[in-house]
């Protein structure tokens, strides 16, 4: 399925997939998720298309994902471990980076899930990774859940209150804080 959608297009549309997305969450990589990760690895090997993962960093799920992809021979320079800033464990993140993957620091503004870091802590983490020499291996983004009609008015309003800047949050809050912390435009 992966290779077909990459080479021929998705469901007869002619629109070709440009990335393979896989997901594991709280509790680690389940057996069915491992099967999917291995299939994604085989599709990557056949096509060269990069792999993006959904993960839960407080459980260090990225370690197992990377281990499976490594076993399959995936070029880890073509792997993005998403949601890596849901925890501030630098040793865990540096371990992933040393293997050659990209980190998605993509849950800004954060802090909505109990026990996860607020945006300021996430930004301090970015500074630490930059200071450790990995500015070229991290990607900042929002993973912003746009208030959707399927949610009731109360949920939509709560999301707006949590992030009134929407897709401008990084520009308006994170980048200025990084500058305050001494990060330059270089």
What does each model-found stretch correspond to?
Residues 2-12, 94, 122-136:
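Short amphipathic alpha-helices and their capping/turn segments at secondary-structure boundaries
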Residues 105-107, 134-160:
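Short acidic/histidine-rich active-site segments
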Residues 165-186:
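Mid-to-C-terminal alpha-helical segments outside catalytic/metal-binding sites
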Residues 31-35, 58-73, 89-97:
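Distinct, well-ordered alpha-helical segments
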Residues 1-50, 102, 107-112:
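Active-site gating/metal-coordination segments in enzymes
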Residues 50-57, 78-86:
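Catalytic beta/alpha-barrel core
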Residues 47-50, 70-77, 95-104, 134-136:
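Glycine-enriched alpha-helix->loop->beta-strand junction motifs that scaffold or abut catalytic
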